[in-house]
A protein has these predicted regions:
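Short pre-active-site segment immediately N-terminal to the catalytic Zn-binding motif
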Residues: 6-25
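Acidic glycine-/aspartate-rich tracts in secreted/extracellular proteins
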Residues: 7-10, 35-39, 67-69, 96-100, ...
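The catalytic-center signature of Zn2+-dependent metalloproteases
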Residues: 19-84
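Surface beta-strand/loop "capping" patches
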Residues: 99-129
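Hydrophobic "rung" positions of tandem beta-strand repeat architectures
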Residues: 109, 121, 130, 140, ...
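Extracellular, beta-strand-rich repeat scaffolds characterized by small/acidic residue-biased motifs
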Residues: 125, 134-135, 144, 182-187, ...
Length: 210
């Protein structure tokens, strides 16, 4: 069970997706499912840990570390994860098995340049597509356990100020195959996964890697 104190400070918290409070709930749900913190704990020295390079919330909600790909750290994100991240999904599936009926049809995941996203996709099957609409350049990588930069940029923040570079904010979980990607009118980068992909950059000077 998860209990949340509704008195005092927590009574004024914003619990909407993208907030640190919503991320905290996901973190605590991770504990109820058996997930542990990935960092060293001197009280439990024999507990398995992740390498420092992977100990980041962009990889697992069970981390306490907010950092970009170059290691610049802060104390939160400008927009927090709204789903378990790729290592969380992999660990849960290792313990309980994958949900093979979740998004098993032909699904389209829609994004825009005005939206803000921070999520990992688990898709069990079908012929699926990433559909991005907008003029801002975007970067879409269809390979599992890889991140994309899509929609409004998400930053690590230190006391409310953006630091470092934007972080990948849309990830594809291990075992998920997304076949197609269609982007907007900006100068986009699309990277395929070798699964008979349709990669369409529409307008703009695009780069497509297959």
């Amino acid at each position: 069970d998860i209990w949340v104190n509704t008195l005092g400070l927590l009574n004024a918290q914003d619990w909407n997706p993208g907030t640190i409070s919503f991320e905290t709930i996901l973190h605590e749900i991770g504990h109820t499912l058996g997930l542990k913190h990935p960092f060293y704990n001197s009280d439990k020295p024999d507990t398995a840990t992740l390498p420092t390079s992977l100990d980041s919330i962009i990889n697992t909600l069970m981390s306490y570390t907010y950092k970009d790909l170059e290691g610049v750290e802060g104390n939160e994100f400008s927009f927090h994860p709204t789903t378990p991240m790729v290592l969380d999904i992999a660990a849960i599936q290792y313990m309980y098995g994958a949900n093979t009926s979740f998004h098993s049809g032909n699904d389209t995941y829609r994004y825009s340049d005005t939206g803000t996203y921070h999520e990992a996709l688990w898709d069990a099957g079908g012929i699926d597509a990433i559909l991005y609409s907008g003029a801002a350049p975007t970067f879409v990588n269809l390979n599992p356990i890889h991140g994309s930069f899509i929609g409004q940029p998400v930053f690590v923040q230190s006391n409310g100020v953006n630091v470092g570079k934007p972080v990948p904010n849309m990830w594809i979980a291990k075992g998920t195959i997304i076949e197609n990607a269609i982007t907007g009118t900006g100068n986009d980068i699309l990277i395929g996964n070798g699964i008979a992909n349709l990669l369409d950059g529409n307008l703009g000077i695009d780069t497509v890697l297959i």
